[in-house]
């Protein structure tokens, strides 16, 4: 619910501010007077992404330790369904041989899903706790709505793409792929390099921006509903949007995982 001393514009702007650390002075940034510098760190995005990553590890480790060949419990059944789903996706999409791809795909899917799931929390709950209990000037709780997080994950995928390309094709084969495709003639090397370079760089950029754009839009809609409507009428739009958003957060986690598998499969193909 919007604070009584805030206009709707102030309320929306307040919820779109990250809790930032100025890396030059190691002090918290005033969201109303941010410094004109690149050297800031979004502490809230880092904190929640790390916590959710640890939660993923603890959940799966707990199930692995308690796994039984008998009748599984509900939680174990849910985890097994997720693992089976990811394993089937990797089997269908990845055509190379690597023991890394399935664990990587599982980590990406569950981690991104958990980060997206934070969008379903009441919009004012954690920011209110952060402000009134810990004295934080701002707090955003959806890591995947921060372009720094999504592009960082995409950068990790890009490094793996380069690694598998060089591993499977060698430096020479990878260089030929960039310079002799699609036109197999030395005269077209500059053109090929531009085309293939743009194609290669567009993969991580589109991967990160797609997830960020969808989650930022979803977060913004929740903020608009909470900031512009009276509290007693918010549920009329919030409930249907939250139900629809469950599909979106799951789909976006799957798309990020699926594209990662496809890109790594393409990188692993020998020409």
From Swiss-Prot:
Belongs to the ATPase A chain family. It is a multi-pass membrane protein. GO terms for biological process: proton motive force-driven plasma membrane ATP synthesis. F-type ATPases have 2 components, CF(1) - the catalytic core - and CF(0) - the membrane proton channel. CF(1) has five subunits: alpha(3), beta(3), gamma(1), delta(1), epsilon(1). CF(0) has three main subunits: a(1), b(2) and c(9-12). The alpha and beta chains form an alternating ring which encloses part of the gamma chain. CF(1) is attached to CF(0) by a central stalk formed by the gamma and epsilon chains, while a peripheral stalk is formed by the delta and b chains. InterPro entries: ATP_syn_F0_a_bact/chloroplast (IPR045082), ATP_synth_F0_asu (IPR000568), ATP_synth_F0_asu_AS (IPR023011), F0_ATP_A_sf (IPR035908). Signal peptide: none annotated. NCBIfam families: ATP_synt_6_or_A, PRK05815.1-1. One of its GO terms (cellular component) is plasma membrane. Its main location: membrane. It is found in: Cell inner membrane. The chain crosses the membrane at residues 38-58, 100-120, 146-166, 220-240, 242-262. GO terms for molecular function: proton-transporting ATP synthase activity, rotational mechanism. This is ATP synthase subunit a. It comes from the Bacteria. PANTHER family: ATP SYNTHASE SUBUNIT A, CHLOROPLASTIC (PTHR42823:SF3). Key component of the proton channel; it plays a direct role in the translocation of protons across the membrane. It holds the Pfam family ATP-synt_A. PROSITE patterns: ATPASE_A (PS00449). Keywords: ATP synthesis, Cell inner membrane, Cell membrane, CF(0), Hydrogen ion transport, Ion transport, Membrane, Transmembrane, Transmembrane helix, Transport. CDD domains: ATP-synt_Fo_a_6. HAMAP family: ATP_synth_a_bact. It comes from Citrobacter koseri (strain ATCC BAA-895 / CDC 4225-83 / SGSC4696).
């Amino acid at each position: 619910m919007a604070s009584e001393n805030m206009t709707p514009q102030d309320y929306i702007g307040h919820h779109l501010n990250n809790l930032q650390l100025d890396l030059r002075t190691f002090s918290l940034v005033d969201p109303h007077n941010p410094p004109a510098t690149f050297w800031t760190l979004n502490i809230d995005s880092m904190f929640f992404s790390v916590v959710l990553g640890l939660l993923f590890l603890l959940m799966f480790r707990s199930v692995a330790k308690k796994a039984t060949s008998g009748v599984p419990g509900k939680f174990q059944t849910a985890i097994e369904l997720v693992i089976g789903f990811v394993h089937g996706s990797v089997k269908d999409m990845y055509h190379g041989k690597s023991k890394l791809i399935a664990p990587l795909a599982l980590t990406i899917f569950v981690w991104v899903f958990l980060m997206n799931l934070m969008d379903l929390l009441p919009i004012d709950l954690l920011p209110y706790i952060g402000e009134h209990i810990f004295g934080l000037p701002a707090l955003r709780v959806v890591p995947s709505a921060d372009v720094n997080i999504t592009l960082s994950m995409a950068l990790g995928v890009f490094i793996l793409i380069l690694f598998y390309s060089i591993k499977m094709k060698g430096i020479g084969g990878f260089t030929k792929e960039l310079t002799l495709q699609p036109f197999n003639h030395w005269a077209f090397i500059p053109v090929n390099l531009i085309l293939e370079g743009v194609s290669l760089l567009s993969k991580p950029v589109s991967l990160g921006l797609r997830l960020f754009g969808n989650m930022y839009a979803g977060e913004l809609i929740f903020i608009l509903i909470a900031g512009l409507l009276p509290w007693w009428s918010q549920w009329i739009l919030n409930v249907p949007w939250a139900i629809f958003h469950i599909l979106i957060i799951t789909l976006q986690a799957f798309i990020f995982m699926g594209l990662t598998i496809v890109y790594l499969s393409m990188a692993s193909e020998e020409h």
